[in-house]
Design a protein with these regions (language model features):
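HIT superfamily nucleotide-processing domains
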Residues: 1-269
Length: 269
C-alpha cells in the first residue's frame, strides 16, 4: 500500500501538524546555490566603520522604539490622529532593533570565524537578553543571524540582528503553553525527552557532544531546520555561564561546518 505523497506529522509540544514530503529522494541540486555577497570591503562597510579602532564585538542600536502595535485595521484607524486616544487600547512606540557586530574586517561566516569571536557574540547576546529583562520593557527578544543576500543579509559583515518585541509571537506562546501541558501530562521536560530519544534513535541526529545535541525535528517546518538543545536543563539563555557559551559556540560552528560539507548554500544560520 502506498504511503502517499505527504506524511502529516504532529509537533509533540505545540500540537501543530506539518505536511512532510516522503515519496521522493533528497536532491541536493535543488538547494545547491552559492551564497551571494554584496562585495563590501572594510573601507565601504558601515559595520567596519563602527568597529574602527576596536578589536572586540560591539552592540549597535539601529532603531530605538522600533515597533508600533497597530492591531487590526479597524484598531489602527481608530487610533490614528483624530481617532481614539492610544491610552485607550493602543500601544505606543516601544521595543528596539539592534545588531551585535564582529570587529572590523570580519566578513566571514559564523562557521568560519574564530572560536573567540563566536563566543564573544554569544556573550553579547546573553547580555542583551539580561539587560532587556532587567529594564522590564520587553516581552520577547529574537536574535537572528543571516549570511548572504539569499538569506536577506544587507551586509557582508558578521553580525547578529536582534529584535526587542512588545509581544510574544504566537508560535513561542504555543511552545510555552504546550511545554507546560507536556510536563503535566508526561511528568518531564519535553526537550529533555527529545535529547534522550534523538540520541537513542539517531536517524535524525546531526551532532552531539557532552553539552548539546543537534537534530532535525520530526515535524520540521522547512528544509534543513535543525534544533540545538543543551543537555543541561535550564530555561533562560540569559543565565548561561561562560563555560556553557564556549560549548554552545563550538556546537554552532561544528553544525554549520557540517552543513557546509553538504555543498549546500551557506545562506542562513
Amino acid at each position: 500500500m502506498s504511503r502517499g505523497l505527504f506524511e502529516l506529522r504532529k509537533d509533540a509540544i505545540t500540537g501543530w501538524w506539518v505536511a512532510v514530503v516522503v515519496d521522493r529522494e533528497f536532491n541536493p541540486r535543488r538547494f545547491n546555490r552559492a551564497a551571494k555577497h554584496i562585495g563590501q570591503t572594510p573601507d565601504d562597510c558601515p559595520n567596519c566603520d563602527l568597529a574602527a579602532g576596536g578589536d572586540h564585538v560591539q552592540v549597535r542600536t539601529l532603531k530605538q522604539d522600533a515597533f508600533i502595535v497597530a492591531g487590526t485595521e479597524k484598531e489602527a484607524r481608530e487610533a490614528a490622529p483624530g481617532g481614539r486616544e492610544p491610552g485607550l487600547g493602543m500601544v505606543g512606540d516601544n521595543g528596539s532593533y539592534q545588531t551585535i557586530v564582529a570587529p572590523r574586517g570580519h566578513h566571514e561566516s559564523l562557521a568560519e570565524t574564530s572560536p573567540q569571536i563566536a563566543f564573544d557574540m554569544l556573550a553579547q547576546a546573553r547580555d542583551v537578553l539580561t539587560n532587556a529583562r532587567n529594564a522590564e520593557k520587553t516581552d520577547y527578544l529574537q536574535i537572528v543571524q543571516n549570511f548572504g543576500t539569499n538569506a536577506g543579509a544587507l551586509t557582508d559583515h558578521l553580525c547578529f540582528d536582534f529584535y526587542d518585541l512588545p509581544q510574544i509571537p504566537h508560535r513561542i506562546g504555543e511552545e510555552l503553553g504546550g511545554a507546560a501541558r507536556f510536563v503535566i501530562r508526561e511528568g518531564e521536560c519535553p526537550w529533555c525527552r527529545m535529547v534522550r530519544e534523538e540520541v537513542a534513535e539517531p536517524a535524525r541526529l546531526v551532532y552531539e557532544d557532552a553539552a548539546s545535541v543537534c537534530f532535525a525535528p520530526y515535524a520540521s517546518r522547512s528544509p534543513f531546520e535543525l534544533w540545538v538543545v543543551p543537555r543541561h536543563h535550564a530555561a533562560d539563555f540569559g543565565t548561561a555561564s561562560d563555560a556553557q557559551l564556549v560549548s554552545a559556540a563550538d556546537t554552532l560552528q561544528s553544525v554549520l561546518r557540517l552543513l557546509a560539507s553538504l555543498a549546500l548554500p551557506k545562506s542562513a544560520a
